[in-house]
Amino acid sequence: NHMRFHSFCPPEAAFAAADRVGFYLQPEGPSWPNHGSSLGNGEPIDDYLWAEAERMVKAYGNHPSFCMMAIGNEPRGNWVEWVSKFVDYWKEHDTRRVYTGASVGGGWQWQPKSQYHVKAGARGLEWARQQPNSMDDFSDNRFILQAGTTPYVSHETGQWCGFPHFNERRK
């Protein structure tokens, strides 16, 4: 019952619907700053994301479904220091939700200030290292073990191609 919004914040209707049915939402700042930009290097995106986070919380912060927050997806640059400041700020200024700096793949650094981690590699879904399978031991996963006691949310595990057979549906 958790839904992550990859690099964006959904509209009011998503929060209202999630409040009604009991979904937990993780909106993110509109950022995937490893394609032409980066965090923590003094670029305009640094200030933009701070302001956008403030706008998100002001607009939707009272929705009970808005219980998790990240600033974006897979950053580069001096991002660990930048997202650590982001998490520290929000932990101090708004305790209504839990915070992680950014949602990241398995090769990205750990974010020491995050209250939970969104990281790839859970359940044997390590993309290039092994094929998806049902024999993975979740409790023996190297990423889970590295997270320690901090909660761990699997990153992008639902990104699998699906090719429907349209002749199977009723007309």
Tell where the protein language model's regions lie, with residue ranges.
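Substrate-binding/catalytic cleft of secreted carbohydrate-active enzymes
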Residues: 2-171
